[in-house]
Curated annotation (Swiss-Prot):
Has antimicrobial activity. Keywords: Amidation, Amphibian defense peptide, Antimicrobial, Cleavage on pair of basic residues, Secreted, Signal. It comes from Pithecopus hypochondrialis. The lineage of its organism: Eukaryota, Metazoa, Chordata, Craniata, Vertebrata. GO terms for biological process: defense response. This is Phylloseptin-H7. It holds the Pfam family FSAP_sig_propep. Residues 30-41 have a biased composition (Acidic residues). It is found in: Secreted.
């Protein structure tokens, strides 16, 4: 009977450890995805902030060549 209790406790302990590891990996994956989304948004903002100067440069180039 004691052998069964020890085996059961061992199985439960190993199950909890593996569950904890899986949750940690899931959390890290979600953080990486959030970081990637934030990077994409910041790149988009940088591009959009440069857009007016690019347009004005293109307009002045057309005026010079036109």
């Amino acid at each position: 009977m004691a052998f069964l209790k020890k085996s059961l406790f061992l199985v439960l302990f190993l199950g909890l450890v593996s569950l904890s590891i899986c949750e940690e990996e899931k959390r890290e994956t979600e953080e990486e995805e959030n970081d990637q989304e934030e990077d994409d948004k910041s790149e988009e903002k940088r591009f959009l902030s440069l857009l007016p100067s690019l347009v004005s440069g293109a307009v002045s180039l057309v005026k010079i060549l036109g």
